[in-house]
């Protein structure tokens, strides 16, 4: 039985929402029957790893480079460095999951850059959910390419039992938490300045930044709907059914892979995203309807050209089952055995 420590395993209180990636990761490992996760959820997921009873044979670090953004960031940054060095000295394996090209928050840039290069150098295995991540890891450390492995971002099959037959209300659906790096305000401004496009757009997702929400609201036109709240997966399924495409207007500078992309595919959506990372990978995947853009004008062209292009339910189902969370857990365990 392989013992894993997964970071960050944050304690989620009742009524709170969090990124489900970590809990799904934990479950996928334990479902293999060959692994157990030894660190419980905690309100401080880094300092909670101080007791060695919470040290597994393998440490898996996600978003390690974001530690400087934490409360008491300088102290936690030093602890993060010492934790990796201590784990290596004790013969533990280090796995780093490379999620992004760079941190989305542009603060503590030097510390984050140092942590990124540090974890790339000291990892025994680097996992990335986009093929571009292999080249990126090599730029962080010239020896990293040999230990970097591409694994599809795991997902779930949420395809409806029957194909949607209702009317399409929106050309484009933008969903998920609204943050600066996702490029929503820039795209809304583009639409406002190009009213002849006439695209019907629905934006649904909680916007934690009141100033950003107000900026978006000021730029709305008659063809753009903004719903400032987080939808349930049941509601999201209906929005996807009512939309011709899901659009992710992310800024390409930081995005590498996207959970929103995978969740959209899990509902059978046609997806438009920037020509980078996993979007670029899946634009070449014949089973999927994923399209990429380099500038906003290309989004208009994609909508016009592919609006009536059918989705292969069989192709989507095959892709989703192939890249399920249980399969992901098995692949991770096998890779850890070899490193």
Regions found by a protein language model. Give the residues of each.
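Nucleotide-activated donor-binding/catalytic signature segment of Leloir-type glycosyltransferases, i.e.
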Residues: 213-234, 245
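Acidic donor-binding loop of glycosyltransferase active sites
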Residues: 240-255, 269
């Amino acid at each position: 039985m392989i013992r894993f420590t997964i970071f960050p395993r944050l304690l989620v209180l009742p009524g709170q929402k969090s990124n489900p990636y970590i809990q799904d990761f934990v479950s996928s490992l334990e479902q293999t029957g060959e692994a157990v996760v030894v660190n419980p959820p905690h309100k401080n997921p880094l300092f909670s790893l101080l007791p060695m009873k919470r040290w597994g044979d393998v440490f898996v670090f996600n978003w390690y480079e974001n530690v400087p953004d934490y409360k008491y960031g300088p102290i936690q940054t030093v602890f993060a460095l010492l934790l990796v060095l201590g784990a290596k000295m004790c013969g533990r394996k280090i796995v780093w999951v490379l999620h992004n090209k760079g941190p989305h928050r542009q603060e503590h840039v030097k510390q984050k850059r140092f942590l990124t290069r540090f974890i790339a150098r000291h990892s025994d295995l680097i996992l990335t959910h986009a093929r571009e991540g292999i080249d990126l890891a090599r730029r962080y450390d010239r020896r990293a390419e040999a230990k970097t492995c591409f694994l599809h971002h795991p997902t779930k099959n949420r395809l409806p039992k029957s194909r949607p037959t209702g009317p399409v209300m929106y050309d484009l659906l933008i969903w998920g938490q609204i943050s600066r790096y996702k490029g929503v305000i820039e795209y809304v401004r583009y639409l406002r300045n190009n009213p002849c496009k006439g695209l019907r757009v629905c934006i649904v997702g909680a916007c934690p930044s009141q100033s950003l929400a107000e900026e978006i609201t000021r730029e709305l036109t008659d063809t753009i709907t903004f719903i400032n709240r987080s939808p349930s997966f049941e509601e999201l399924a209906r929005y996807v059914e009512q939309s011709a495409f899901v659009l992710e207007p992310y800024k390409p500078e930081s995005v590498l892979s996207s959970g929103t992309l995978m969740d959209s595919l899990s509902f059978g959506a046609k997806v438009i995203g920037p020509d980078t990372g996993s979007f670029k990978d899946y634009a070449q995947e014949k089973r999927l309807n994923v399209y990429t853009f380099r500038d906003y004008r290309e989004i208009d062209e994609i909508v016009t050209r592919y609006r009536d292009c059918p989705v292969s339910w069989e192709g989507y189902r095959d892709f989703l089952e192939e890249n399920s969370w249980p399969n992901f857990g098995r692949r991770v365990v096998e890779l850890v055995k070899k490193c």
